């Protein structure tokens, strides 16, 4: 059995994570990423504008007075990347963004009366699509809208997703002046053959220029995204990509497994599955990446995220206040999330809500004077309990049953009798250690945390979902 101890400088359990490839290969291969619980496939159209406004009003009454986060979805892309599963619109017509910004402003005008004042923003994220599809004047216009309704604060976390192929050094400097202090840079792979196969041609030079500009502009953190499992990738090619990425010295790095779901994401039908690496090759690639990143000093945060030891994510992991939200691991995730733009997903109190996914339907709702809520979900007490448990597993890698008994008034061992029986099987496999009043995820279990969290997912246990998920490792 090939078990590799990972050289990690920061760990909540003071034990080095272990990459046990035989164990990884033996367990169920797909499952939720748990950026929310319940997962988005549980959202339903019985939750609409009225339910969303009710949740906002409860927040304003002080019942759910959490810090506030804002997500803005910019759906436009110049070209299509075949692997992509995001909600996007492919166009080169910048005037479409002018019309879209008008509707963002309409949405904020409709939202404002229900926000209860001009709140401070703990967190801001521009996602897409490609947020930097917007030109400098359009970005300025969106930021003017943000400042009209919210207050930016010195220690806020304000991030934007960047496509280095379509942004200049001057635009990056402009983003810094506007107030952005964190950047996520899409790379995926530097190998030309892989890039051609997924229709994303991106040079090292243009990527470096953007990252250098971010540092010049004073960005606190630069994160890069990679994907393994793409066509023509192999262990040798990924070595070159990792070495090239490390020369850019990013503060954070996300290493995602490519989820091939062509029945859901039509662009993926253009990917030649005959040249996609097999399971063993993908495990080889993952193992190499994990070993190399940790040997170079990056801390394994969880799932597919790595960060430098002095990065806020690593500090949050070490000190036990790491959180998880729709953007992944975060230090500010325990916020109420207001989300605007087509298809965007928000979280207010014990509710989730999603805007219309079709841009014409999004525009039509706003033209009619309605918030464009397409669907959502009201969590019940069991959902809230399980959401907290899954959050603790994903971010702290341990559970203390007594906390849940105190907060929720339940006898934990009886309430979760079936789940704890399943945990005994995972203990036999070496993924968890069970104790009288809790459990701890083992070094082997750190890489399989999604499999462990799935045990507490009511909807999966009762087969109430037909969703197709990405692989857990």
Residue spans for each PLM region:
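Flexible, acidic/Gly-rich N-terminal and inter-domain linker regions that tether
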Residues: 1-68
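Short alpha-helical scaffolding segments that buttress acidic/His motifs in well-ordered protein cores
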Residues: 84, 388-390, 452
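Local cysteine-cluster metal-coordination motifs and their immediate loop/turn environment
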Residues: 72-88
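C-terminal scaffold of the Radical SAM
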Residues: 3-4, 67, 90-114, 120-413, ...
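Short amphipathic alpha-helical interaction segments
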Residues: 411-425
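Short, amphipathic alpha-helical interaction segments positioned at domain boundaries
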Residues: 444-473
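Minor-groove-contacting beta-hairpin "wing" of winged helix-turn-helix DNA-binding domains
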Residues: 438-442
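A short, conserved structural fragment
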Residues: 427-437
